Amino acid sequence: MKRAFVFPGQGSQTPGMGQALAAAFPAARQLFEEVDEALSQHLSRLMFEGPESELMLTENAQPALLAASLAVIRVLEREAGFDIARQAAYVAGHSLGEYSALAAAGALSVAEAARLVKRRGQAMQKAVPVGVGAMAALLGLDIEAARAVAEAAAQGQVCDLANDNSPGQIVVSGHRGAVERAVALAMERGARAIMLPVSAPFHCSLMSPAADIMTEALAETALEAPRVPLVANVAAATTSEPAEIKQLLVEQTTRMVRWRESVLLFAANEVEEVVEIGAGRVLAGLVKRIDRTLSARSVGMPAEVEALVQVL
């Protein structure tokens, strides 16, 4: 069966994440210890025990999600002889998850990936003062209608399309006032709209200071060609070229995540199953809304790991 392996982004973090996996598999415990050591931080304790308020901070949530995903990959490798180059036709990650995908595919070491996403989280949080920015999900509009709403709402401020998640689920990001106007305009057009509980306006032009920091961070990073083609967020196209991947990771900081198109690329290339690796079930749910011909599963708990091993 042809499979794509995908990796979740911010929003999927919850206290207790990874704890059952660490209890069941020594390989997962070892992975969490490696991340703790790379960051000089007891991140695994924060993941397992909270407090939730600290885990939700962008600079902690991002490496925590990376660690949760890579722990699953490590267990599959150690317990089942999993080789991503043989088992995956593609890898992709939603926003932060793109770094997890690259590490899983051998382009980044665990330590390098952990340090990069910690720096990314800090840079994104500092780019815009708390309260200045906001994000909202527009539900029931197609991409062109959402773009028209964002343009009308801007009024000299920033209101960009941040995520094209699935048909009828578009996220906008920018100045709080502009995003609130977008919510009102979307509702006037018969859509539902929800302000999102985020600490910064991700994937919009207000993140330019963070993009500058990531340009510097990635220039200092040894990134190898992934062993599996990456479907990049901002291109919704495959790449395996390290210099191009670095540029796309920088662009991803300020540009829209083209998730719907990425999943359609899987379907167009005869992928049959999309496997979400790590915390939560967000991406598997989106896959099913994008293309019902694709099967999708989430793998983060010990029983889910064991079930996947049976079919690989």
Give the positions of each predicted feature.
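FabD-like malonyl-/acyl-CoA
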Residues: 1-146, 196, 273-306
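Short, flexible segments with low predicted structural confidence
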Residues: 3, 7, 237-238, 259
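Alpha/beta catalytic cores of group-transfer enzymes, especially the acyltransferase/condensing modules
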Residues: 10-13, 39, 105-255
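Soluble or luminal CAZymes and related metallo-dependent hydrolases
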Residues: 27, 254-258
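Short hydrophobic/charged patches on amphipathic alpha-helices used for structural packing
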Residues: 260-264
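Non-catalytic positions within long, well-ordered alpha-helices that form the structural scaffold/packing
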Residues: 267-270
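Post-His helix in hydrolase/transferase enzymes
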Residues: 311-312
